[in-house]
């Protein structure tokens, strides 16, 4: 978390971010805490940082993949980015529990923010059954999802 507070430029910060992501993050608390600390650091650099996140999603390190997912969850569930976020999330294939939970959590949060875009995405998704069911569970546990939407999502689980 100290890396997020370093008094360096955005360009100088990226190598610290990469090193932390690839070598220090080793559990969900490191991942989620680090991602939450980056708000001020990426402000004004959202588009370029969104591109930078691709490297984490493509990593062999499951914790780096989770960092990429949680960064998108925290900062990119907006109308401008959501279609690309869903596409990137859909492309992640992992058997690692915390990566899969990150996918489900991101999708449930995205549903709460923009149901219509997510509903369109669900018509052609490539999620594995476990992630899909977990997404539905997480969305149905959310107070931000309407009763009608919860019923709709539960109906998808049965298909």
What are these regions (language model features)?
Residues 1-159:
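Alpha-helical scaffold domains
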């Amino acid at each position: 978390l100290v890396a997020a507070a370093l008094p360096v430029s955005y360009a100088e910060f990226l190598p610290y971010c990469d090193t932390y992501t690839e070598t220090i993050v080793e559990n969900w608390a490191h991942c989620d805490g680090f991602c939450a600390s980056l708000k001020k650091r990426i402000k004004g650099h959202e588009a370029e940082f969104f591109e930078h996140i691709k490297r984490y999603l493509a990593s062999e390190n499951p914790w780096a993949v989770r960092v990429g997912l949680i960064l998108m969850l925290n900062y990119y569930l907006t109308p401008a980015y959501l279609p690309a976020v869903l596409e990137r999330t859909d492309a992640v294939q992992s058997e690692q529990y915390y990566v899969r939970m990150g996918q489900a959590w991101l999708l449930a949060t995205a549903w709460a923010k923009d149901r219509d875009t997510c509903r369109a995405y669900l018509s052609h998704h490539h999620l594995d059954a476990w992630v899909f069911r977990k997404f539905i569970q997480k969305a149905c546990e959310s107070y931000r999802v309407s009763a009608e939407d919860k019923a709709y999502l539960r109906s998808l689980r049965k298909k």
